[in-house]
A protein has these predicted regions:
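Hinge/capping helix and adjacent helix->loop/strand transition within the periplasmic-binding protein
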Residues: 79-85, 99-186, 235, 248-281
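N-terminal signal peptide c-region/cleavage motif recognized by signal peptidases
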Residues: 16-18
Length: 324
């Protein structure tokens, strides 16, 4: 009797799963941005979310859950029901956080279903316009002399800005005053107003402010110059051959999300990444999408795993003590 009941239940579940996938989504989806509004991840999340919303026929609501270098928003996603209605956009900080934090409430590699890679691009080292330096050489000399007298913003431990700062301090053999924010959006506001001295931020956030003359750029952290800032040198060409920090974003769902739902969301992301308007916006912001055929769920999982290993080595070598 029990065997027949279990068999019947299995048949019902098997029949219902395709229906669930076919009708998904039948209500709004929440896309968690683990940093404050106005920052690079927020900008990208809204761009991608708007396109995916049109493809899926449902509203995608952006929820900014900042704090702890992006781990607060990641934890919220990991705890969510694995039904495709809670998504996460995150960048390299998700991978680095696996080493930077001792007691994360999730397993970085196991607790997320990658939906696809979105974009990749460099950071730009910038300062307030009131700083009396004009060139990278002058800025570096000023940082070395000032030490903790100069303030650099970060989006918290484990954020890309924090990792960039970590590498910069190691290369210059200096410790400066790091000011944590809930995202580089608020940090950029303080930089523009002159309350913050310097910041290492993504091109998506910094290029519009540079072009508007509201902040001063010194160098990019990629191996090649940025097309939108052709006169801005790379740190690599400026005497720091081992300095490279490249940001990458990916989209995730909680572990256990049905494969059919993962594929449907991944397909909607692919539509967004082929949208000419989004590609034009990416170009304006100095970032590029991952190549077609190299950005699906499997590629995103491989990228996450390799980046966890990469940053574990970098952070361990730096002597950084993991935080709680």
């Amino acid at each position: 009797m029990l065997g027949r009941l279990f068999s019947a239940a299995a048949i019902v579940m098997g029949l219902s799963m395709p229906t669930t996938a076919q009708t998904f989504p039948d209500r709004p989806i929440t896309l968690i941005v683990p940093f404050a509004a106005g920052g690079p991840s927020d900008v990208l999340g809204r761009l991608i979310g708007q396109s995916m919303s049109a493809t899926l026929g449902q509203t995608i609501l952006i929820e900014n859950v900042g704090g702890a270098g992006g781990t607060t928003g990641a934890a919220r996603t990991a705890r969510a029901a694995p039904d495709g209605y809670t998504l996460l956009i995150h960048h390299l900080a998700l991978a680095a956080g696996a080493t930077l934090y001792r007691n994360l409430p999730y397993d970085t590699v196991k607790d997320f279903e990658p939906l696809g890679l979105i974009n990749q691009g460099p950071y730009v080292i910038v300062s307030k316009t009131g700083l009396e330096t004009r060139t990278l050489a002058e800025f570096i000399e000023h940082v070395k002399k000032s030490g903790r007298g100069i303030s650099f913003g970060t989006a918290g431990v484990g954020s890309g800005s924090h990792l960039c700062n970590m590498m910069l301090q190691a290369q210059l053999k200096v410790q400066f005053n790091e000011i944590p924010y809930r995202g580089t959006g608020p940090a950029m506001n303080d930089l523009i107003s002159g309350q913050l001295d310097a910041l290492c931020d993504q091109t998506t956030n910094s290029i519009p402010q540079i072009q508007g003359g509201r902040i001063r750029p010194y160098a990019v952290t990629a191996l090649q110059r940025v097309e939108q800032l052709p006169n801005l040198p790379t740190l690599h060409e400026s005497g720091f051959p081992n300095f490279e920090v490249t940001v990458w974003h990916a989209l995730y769902a909680p572990r256990g999300t049905p494969d059919a739902v993962v594929q449907k969301l991944s397909a909607a992301l692919e539509v967004a990444l082929k949208d000419p308007a989004i590609l034009a916006r990416f170009a304006d912001l100095g970032t590029t999408p991952y190549p077609v055929g190299e950005r699906g769920p499997a590629a995103a999982r491989a990228k996450l795993e390799s980046e966890v290993a990469k940053w574990r080595q970098v952070i361990t070598d730096s002597g950084f003590t993991p935080t709680n």
